[in-house]
Design a protein with these regions (language model features):
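A short beta-loop-alpha structural element at the N-terminal edge
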Residues: 3-17
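Conserved GNAT acetyl-CoA-binding A-motif
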Residues: 107, 114-126
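Conserved acetyl-CoA pyrophosphate-binding loop and the N-cap/start of the following alpha-helix
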Residues: 97-109
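A conserved beta-turn-beta hairpin within the catalytic core of GNAT-like acetyltransferases
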Residues: 73-88, 98
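A short helix-loop-beta-strand connector motif used in the catalytic cores of GNAT acetyltransferases and
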Residues: 44-56, 87
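Conserved beta-strand-loop-alpha-helix junction that forms the acyl-donor binding cleft
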Residues: 122-132, 147-150
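Conserved GNAT-fold acetyl-CoA-binding loop/helix
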Residues: 23-43
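Conserved beta-strand in the GNAT
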Residues: 56, 62-71, 87, 92
């Protein structure tokens, strides 16, 4: 039976295993790829103490999907009076479970929880494969953002 739930700190091992699996798949890495201590340490710290929500999807005891929402608090503006914004990240469903509405349900759960937390905007970086899902949920392209990377 498929179970959807918002993860808690008690789920840290499931969160970490799903995160590392997602990173391997998305980046085309082998199953035995060893991540840097920094990535593992910082991911664990973020799941335990970061301002985030993650949905886990389980089939029995096995994680088959995950999606995270990261929250930011910036100076309030007229269009964002709470200053609360969010960024949707790492929406992942195992290959054999795709095209069953799992990603949609995870994202809908996170959207509902995000509005309930007072956020006024959700951003995301869409892959080509994910774009139709996000558009069907009402996401639009934005020209507001510029990025400076180190």
């Amino acid at each position: 039976m498929i179970e959807y739930r918002i993860a808690t700190n008690d789920d840290i091992e499931l969160l970490m295993s799903s995160r590392l699996e997602m990173l391997r798949v998305v980046n085309g890495l082998s199953n035995d790829y060893v991540f840097s201590d920094e990535i593992v340490r910082e991911s664990r710290e973020y799941f335990l103490h970061g301002d985030q929500l993650t949905v886990l999807v389980l089939d029995g005891s096995e994680v088959i999907g995950c999606a995270s929402m990261s929250f930011m608090w910036i100076m309030p503006t007229f269009s964002h009076p709470t200053g609360r914004r969010a960024h949707l990240m790492n929406v992942y469903t195992r290959n054999e479970y795709r095209r069953q509405g799992i990603a949609r349900k995870m994202v809908e759960m996170l959207i509902d929880a995000t509005w309930a937390k007072g956020a006024t905007e959700i951003s995301l970086d869409a892959t080509v494969m994910g774009r139709p899902l996000y558009e069907s949920l009402g996401f639009k392209n934005s020209t507001e953002c510029m990025v400076l990377a180190k």
